[in-house]
UniProtKB/Swiss-Prot annotation:
Function: Catalyzes the GTP-dependent ribosomal translocation step during translation elongation. During this step, the ribosome changes from the pre-translocational (PRE) to the post-translocational (POST) state as the newly formed A-site-bound peptidyl-tRNA and P-site-bound deacylated tRNA move to the P and E sites, respectively. Catalyzes the coordinated movement of the two tRNA molecules, the mRNA and conformational changes in the ribosome.
GO molecular function: GTP binding; GTPase activity; translation elongation factor activity
Similarity annotation: Belongs to the TRAFAC class translation factor GTPase superfamily. Classic translation factor GTPase family. EF-G/EF-2 subfamily.
Record InterPro entries: EFG_II, EFG_III, EFG_III/V, EFG_IV, EFG_V-like, EFTu-like_2, G_TR_CS, P-loop_NTPase
Transmembrane segments: none
Keyword terms, alphabetized: Cytoplasm, Elongation factor, GTP-binding, Nucleotide-binding, Protein biosynthesis
Protein's UniProt keywords contain Chaperone: no
Binding site for GTP: 24-31, 91-95, 145-148
Highest rank taxon of the organism: Bacteria
Name under which the protein is recorded: Elongation factor G
Primary localization class, coarse: cytoplasm
Length: 706
């Protein structure tokens, strides 16, 4: 992954830039860590806690809702200076319902800090975040946080990093004390002890390693050298000669990290102000600068051939809009500059629609505050004003016609109906929906053609709750909401033939088209919703009407015959047909295709699929029975249970349909001491009794159509 940029000597500024994300499972302490980083780098002058008594809330949680709920909902951007380096930071949500915020951040970052709780270790969302980091080849360091908490065990977390995430996790530090006795860390590169004293841990004392830790430190130091030497012949030779230097060790660790073959592990407690400054040193020492990362784009003038972009401000401009926000300053577009230079007054072109825009105002963001700048270069993350675009659009200065691959957007799994309490708010509701769907690709809306109701879709209950609350606060729209609906799907389980002739004579030109073939299931693991195969020979269906048949098939996918939900996992093969010289037309073959599909679908043993969620529940061991009982009652399949230090962790797969209201049940059955997280896992067939109930309900609701 690491690459030298040909014939271009990168500027000092580029080499001293780090674009990093801070990601983790909810409540691992990401936002608290970011708050400390901003404090130690003098970006803020007082520390405010996420759920602090002062009511101010963390700097990066700028939305009122974030401060009230104590969670991060949107990714927030800021930058700071540390030891002559510029660090652009994006603090991302840990809750799985806001996973697209993590996705869009990692798409434009060069590196990341994976924050893990020293007690809970690797949790479900840690696994999701790690998978997202792999998708975008993001090098990372791990920070084991909360080592001041009862039950903290960093070495157990390192084993989980190796086993659950398959990381080559190597500690570069060990803690001095744990829980209430946490005093500092031992640096395994310098082999010195560091204590964080004085107000807010500002006074860093370097001392010799305590006697009771010398043996462990030496053992871990040797393990670190052994791991790092895999990435440096120079270090290997120096080890044989007994002369390794700090610089050699750091250089080798950096190479392994950037090549995604090693994860250096840091330790501390952000809340107790211990270890954060040394983590910042690690960001500079081990994480990638823009020069170290190979970014690619698709050349639109050359069959979308992949080209490599250079972090060179003298080259033609290429930048990516990765996030939209409609704040108090109007629409903001967050942009990562990959190549070239972006300046006020420039004309830039949106590669998705060839629209040109004039750059009126450029800013660096600091959470919800901004600082005006005149220009930005390759490697910078900044914000533009007044640019109408969508998330994932590529901009150039017109000299290149390239587009960057957009980010992965997961499909929504939950929906509900909404309507404004008062008709005078309809205009504001439309504005809110338009804005939110533009900002967040996982928040979707449509009007049901039959009922005329507005339906919103999202990643979970909390996701939709937050948008409903934002409509009320930001647009003054009070909503009446229906019960949450599960995003069921329909599919087929066997192969079935179809042969349908559409014939209509009404005087003048009639309609004629015959479509024959078969449909078969696509295995769910292939994650392909639909496949069309043309095996017609001898001109039984003229070439110009093949696409008409495909259109007819596709029109049926939106609404299955069992319960009216979208159809997935169907391969349609046409192998015969017939046409009429006068009466055949595009519309005739579309209609024939539609009826042929329905005929085949009803014969192919259709079934209903439901979303299955991966659920993880953490709580005191005394409530394990209550937790298992609550999951079993919800058709849950227990995958794994672990118990350590009077805490139990339960992993299960549970149908989404049975998870509504689970947070209330869990709270009451565990005296509010347990918490859970869930994320979409897969689609699976619903049991027969559930299917019958769903079909019965669908028939009652649609009896007027019959």
């Amino acid at each position: 992954m690491s690459t030298a940029v040909a014939e271009f000597k990168p500027s000092e500024k580029l080499l001293k830039t780090r674009n990093i994300g801070i990601s983790a499972h909810i409540d691992s302490g990401k936002t608290t860590l970011t708050e400390r980083i901003l404090f130690y780098t003098n970006r803020i002058h007082a520390i405010h806690e996420v759920r602090g008594k002062d009511g101010v809330g963390a700097k990066m949680d700028s939305m009122d809702l974030e401060r009230e709920r104590g969670i991060t909902i949107q990714s927030a951007a800021t930058y700071c200076q540390w030891k002559n380096h510029t660090i652009n930071i994006i603090d991302t949500p840990g809750h799985v319902d806001f996973t697209v915020e993590v996705e869009r951040s990692l798409r434009v970052l060069d590196s990341a800090i994976l924050v893990l709780c020293g007690v809970a270790g690797v949790q479900s969302q840690s696994i999701t975040v790690d998978r997202q980091m792999r998708r975008y080849n993001v090098p990372r360091v791990a920070f084991i946080n909360k080592l001041d908490r009862t039950g903290a065990n960093p070495f157990r977390v390192i084993e989980q990093l190796k086993e659950k995430l398959k990381h080559n996790a190597v500690p570069v530090q060990i803690p001095i004390g744990l829980e209430n006795d946490l005093k500092g860390i031992v640096d395994l590169v310098t082999m010195k002890a560091y204590y964080f004293e004085g107000k807010d841990g500002m006074d860093i004392q370097e001392k010799e390693i305590p006697d009771d830790l010398k043996e462990l430190a030496q053992k871990k130091h040797e393990e670190l050298l052994d791991a790092a030497s895999m990435f440096s012949d120079e270090l290997t030779e120096a080890l044989l000669e007994g002369t390794p230097t700090e610089e050699m060790i750091k250089k080798a660790i950096r190479t392994g990290t950037i090549e995604l073959k090693m994860t250096p592990v840091f330790m501390g407690s952000a809340f107790k102000n211990k270890g954060v400054q040394k983590l910042l040193d690690g960001v500079l020492d081990y994480l990638a600068s823009p020069v170290d990362v190979k970014n690619k784009a698709l050349d639109q003038n050359n069959n979308e051939e992949m080209i490599v972009l250079e972090s060179n401000f003298e080259k033609p401009l290429v930048c990516l809009a990765f996030k939209l926000e409609d704040g108090r300053y109007g629409q903001l577009t967050y942009v990562r500059v990959y190549q070239g230079k972006l300046a006020k007054g420039m004309t830039i072109y949106n590669m998705s629609n060839n629209k040109k825009h004039n750059v009126g105002r450029l800013c660096r963001m600091h959470s919800d505050e901004m600082e005006d700048i005149d220009s930005a270069e390759a490697g910078d993350i900044i914000a533009l004003f007044g640019i109408d675009c969508a998330s994932g659009d590529t901009f150039t200065d017109g000299k290149l016609k390239v587009s960057m691959e957009s980010m992965f957007v997961p499909a929504p799994v939950i929906s509900l109906t909404i309507e404004a309490k008062e008709s005078k708010h309809l205009n504001n509701l439309a504005k809110a929906l338009n804005r939110f769907t533009k900002e967040d690709p996982t928040f979707q809306t449509h009007v049901d053609q039959e009922s005329g109701q507005t339906i919103i879709k999202g990643m979970g209950e909390l996701h939709l709750e937050v948008y409903i609350e934002r409509m009320k606060r930001e647009y003054g729209v009070e909503l009446i909401t229906g019960a949450p609906q599960v995003a069921y799907r329909e599919t087929i389980t066997s192969k079935a033939d179809f042969d349908y002739t559409h014939k209509k004579q009404t005087g003048g030109q009639g309609q004629f088209g015959r479509v024959a073939g078969y449909m078969e299931p696509i295995p769910l693991e292939e994650t392909l919703d639909y496949d069309f195969v043309n095996k017609v020979v001898g001109g039984a269906i003229p070439r110009e009407y093949i696409q008409s048949v495909d259109k007819g098939f596709k029109s049926c996918l939106e609404r299955g015959s069992l319960i009216g939900f979208p159809i997935i996992g169907v391969r349609c093969v046409i192998n015969d047909g017939a046409y009429h010289d006068v009466d055949s037309s595009d519309m005739a073959f579309q209609i024939a295709g539609r009826y042929a599909f329905r005929q085949g679908f009803n014969k192919a043993n259709p079934q209903i699929l439901e979303p299955i969620m991966k659920v993880e529940v953490d709580g005191p061991s005394e409530f394990q029975g209550a937790i298992l009982g609550s999951l079993n009652q919800r058709r849950g399949m227990i995958l794994n249970t672990t118990e350590e230090d009077a805490y139990c962790k339960t992993e299960a797969e549970v149908p989404l349909a049975d998870m509504f209201g689970y947070s209330t049940v869990l709270r009451s059955s565990t005296q509010g001491k347990a918490e859970f997280s869930m994320e979409f896992s897969r689609y699976a067939p619903v049991p027969r009794n559930v299917a019958e109930e769903l079909m019965k309900k669908y028939k009652v609701n649609n009896k007027d159509e019959d």
